[in-house]
């Protein structure tokens, strides 16, 4: 009787541990899909840019597409990676608000988003941000 209870508890623990390991494995194997969502064109047509931008192309391992808004040289430039879902057009409402500040901005889409080549990776994001951070502004040289 005592051995049956111990075996039952042991079997339940083994089952719970197995389920936990399977869940962890599934999450680990699908982490890229969980972090980087596909493009969706769910932006509203009434979202129009209220300011001028320049379309820029950044050469890293892949060619990246971005938008640059230049207001004045005396202002700092905000480097903005728009996020892990959607595309540049999905961020127009944010860009209109940023344009009202005393800032220039450069918004870049992740690899694999907004027509960019490649696949998004953590290492690629670090490399792209370091390249853009250490580069002169698009006004100073062609990216």
Regions found by a protein language model. Give the residues of each.
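Conserved small/polar residues in nucleotide/adenosyl-binding loops
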Residues: 133-140
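N-terminal Sec-pathway targeting helices
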Residues: 2-18
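An N-terminal hydrophobic leader/cap segment in hydrolases
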Residues: 17-57
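Glycine-centered tight beta-turn/hairpin loop motif at sheet-sheet or coil-to-beta transitions
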Residues: 59-63
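Membrane-embedded segments
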Residues: 65-132
């Amino acid at each position: 009787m005592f051995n049956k209870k111990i075996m039952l508890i042991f079997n339940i623990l083994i089952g719970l541990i197995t389920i936990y390991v399977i869940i962890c494995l599934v999450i680990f194997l699908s982490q890229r899909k969980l972090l980087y969502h596909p493009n969706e064109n769910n932006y509203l047509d009434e979202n129009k840019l209220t300011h001028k931008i320049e379309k820029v192309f950044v050469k890293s391992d892949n060619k990246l597409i971005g938008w640059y808004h230049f207001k004045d040289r005396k202002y700092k430039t905000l480097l903005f990676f728009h996020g892990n879902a959607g595309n540049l057009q999905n961020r127009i409402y944010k860009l209109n608000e940023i344009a009202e500040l005393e800032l220039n901005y450069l918004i870049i889409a992740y690899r694999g988003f907004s027509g960019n080549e490649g696949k998004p990776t953590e290492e690629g994001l670090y490399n792209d941000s370091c390249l853009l951070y250490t580069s002169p502004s698009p006004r100073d040289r062609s990216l």
